[in-house]
């Protein structure tokens, strides 16, 4: 496949499915966004199939601890009683309770229990229990979760530290550097995207030689540029070098620390961690991928992963089934050009089977907002007749009652057209992509107008 989806996904400004700005694009990625890796849908394109697995903060912190990185003391609690016990064991006069949800903006979020904020400072084990009881088992709503929120199944209970200064640090993959790059800033504990937009000179970058790794002098140079005091530059550099270990060892695409701090004792600590992992490495990173929390994902994401499909739900009403991420985004663009709104991004890849095509239709039609479907296939490796078989099977098995416009070109296209013609189904064929897009937009508009007028309109298939 020439390209595919990078799963951390879409900017909140994009027409993202309401419950999931799917974690908006990682901050490190947005800092490097000027390299042209993002299209206007907010989807990042790679030269190979790549999806990112994100882990909860407490799991990421455990990986850092294994690497010898300095972090605050803390443990995960899955019940209020466990939170009480951990807070008591820490023996600190004040501790921090951090909701574990895979979404940004938790500090300003609201729980369905009414609790404001997903990060709370408490001053006794009893208060830790009371606060965690309002988090665990409750949904947290943030700008990134949308109206459906995200369930909080556990909280991280950790000691409170008092930072003198806060910094931002990340290691991420960057095409323009042809490998990993270190990113640092003296502006930590804030949205690094805002820093990149308002004061880009405050962000420093250091490319890493993928063969030699991080050199000590390189890490020291970055720490100095970030503004660490001379007395702790070496300590900061050591932590940076140690952070590269899990990045390399676990096939990470990003390790982000925000903030990395100098605390009141003069120690360098990583107070928070976000790590993304390349899903192409799942076959050799079973330990990591077994940690995936599917309760944080939409059911359609889980179904798509099982069928090895690249799917992202959006807010529109025109379903899209396409092979290849580049063609999929071009399809969304042309739908938008003609006044329509895509309901999804769905790339079936270059080697899709009849089963995968059927599963793709199940994903599309499970979204009740979808009023019409555009299938756009250019058969190179992908055979058009396989797609046609899947379409016919899906329409029959799923009893699809909404209009389907199919544009097929390439390998075995004549066989595909014959299969569709012989099926007896009212599947609208179109050779020209522009005409196909116009047609599917018009059909969605007809259904939309009918619904607004409270007129019951059904497309009966077969006719």
Curated annotation (Swiss-Prot):
Mg(2+) binds at residues 258, 272. Gene3D superfamilies: ATP-grasp fold, A domain, ATP-grasp fold, B domain, Succinyl-CoA synthetase domains. GO terms for cellular component: mitochondrion; succinate-CoA ligase complex. The modification Phosphothreonine is found at residue 341. It catalyses: succinate + ATP + CoA = succinyl-CoA + ADP + phosphate. The modification N6-succinyllysine is found at residue 88. Its cofactor is Mg(2+). The record marks 94, 162 as: Important for substrate specificity. Substrate binds at residues 323, 380-382. Keywords: Acetylation, ATP-binding, Ligase, Magnesium, Metal-binding, Mitochondrion, Nucleotide-binding, Phosphoprotein, Transit peptide, Tricarboxylic acid cycle. ATP binds at residues 98, 105-107. The modification N6-acetyllysine is found at residues 78, 88, 129, 139, 143, 216, 368, 438. This is Succinate--CoA ligase [ADP-forming] subunit beta, mitochondrial. GO terms for molecular function: ATP binding; magnesium ion binding; succinate-CoA ligase (ADP-forming) activity.
């Amino acid at each position: 496949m020439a390209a595919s989806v990078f799963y951390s996904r879409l900017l909140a400004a994009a027409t993202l499915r309401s419950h999931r700005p799917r974690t908006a694009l990682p901050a490190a990625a947005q800092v490097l966004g000027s390299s042209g890796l993002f299209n206007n849908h907010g989807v990042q394109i790679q030269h190979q199939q790549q999806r990112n697995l994100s882990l909860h903060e407490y799991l990421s912190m455990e990986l850092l601890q294994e690497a010898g990185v300095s972090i605050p003391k803390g443990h995960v609690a899955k019940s209020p009683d466990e939170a009480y016990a951990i807070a008591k064991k820490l023996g600190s006069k004040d501790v921090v309770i951090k909701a574990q949800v895979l979404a940004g903006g938790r500090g300003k979020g609201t729980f369905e229990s009414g609790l404001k904020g997903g990060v709370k400072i408490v001053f006794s084990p009893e208060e830790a229990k009371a606060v965690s009881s309002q988090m665990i088992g409750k949904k947290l709503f943030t700008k990134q979760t949308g109206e459906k929120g995200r369930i909080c199944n556990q909280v991280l209970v950790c000691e409170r530290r008092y930072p003198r200064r806060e910094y931002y640090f990340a290691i991420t993959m960057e095409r323009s550097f042809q490998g990993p790059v270190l990113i640092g800033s003296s502006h930590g504990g804030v949205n690094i995207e805002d820093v990149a937009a308002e004061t880009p000179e405050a962000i420093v970058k250091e490319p890493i030689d993928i063969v030699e790794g991080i050199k000590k002098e390189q890490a020291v140079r970055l720490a100095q540029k970030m503004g660490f005091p001379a007395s702790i530059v070496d300590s900061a550099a050591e932590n940076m070098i140690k952070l590269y270990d899990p990045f390399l060892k676990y096939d990470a695409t990003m390790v982000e620390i925000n903030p990395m701090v100098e605390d009141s004792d003069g120690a360098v600590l990583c107070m928070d961690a976000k790590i993304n992992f390349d899903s192409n490495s799942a076959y050799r990173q079973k330990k990591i991928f077994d940690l995936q929390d599917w309760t944080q994902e939409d059911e359609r994401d889980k179904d798509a992963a099982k069928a090895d499909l690249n799917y992202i739900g959006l807010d529109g009403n025109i379903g899209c089934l396409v092979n290849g991420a580049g063609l999929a985004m071009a399809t969304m663009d042309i739908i938008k050009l003609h006044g329509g709104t895509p309901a999804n991004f769905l790339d079936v890849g270059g080697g899709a089977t009849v089963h995968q095509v059927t599963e793709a239709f199940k994903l599309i039609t499970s979204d009740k907002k979808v009023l019409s479907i555009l299938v756009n296939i250019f058969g190179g490796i992908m055979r058009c007749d396989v797609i046609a078989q899947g379409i016919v099977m899906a329409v029959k098995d799923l009893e699809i009652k909404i209009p389907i416009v199919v544009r097929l070109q390439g390998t075995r296209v004549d066989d595909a057209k014959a299969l569709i013609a012989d099926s007896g189904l009212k599947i609208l064929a179109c050779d020209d992509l522009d005409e196909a897009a116009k047609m599917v937009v018009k059909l969605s508009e007809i259904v939309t107008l009918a619904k607004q007028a409270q007129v019951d309109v059904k497309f009966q298939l077969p006719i």
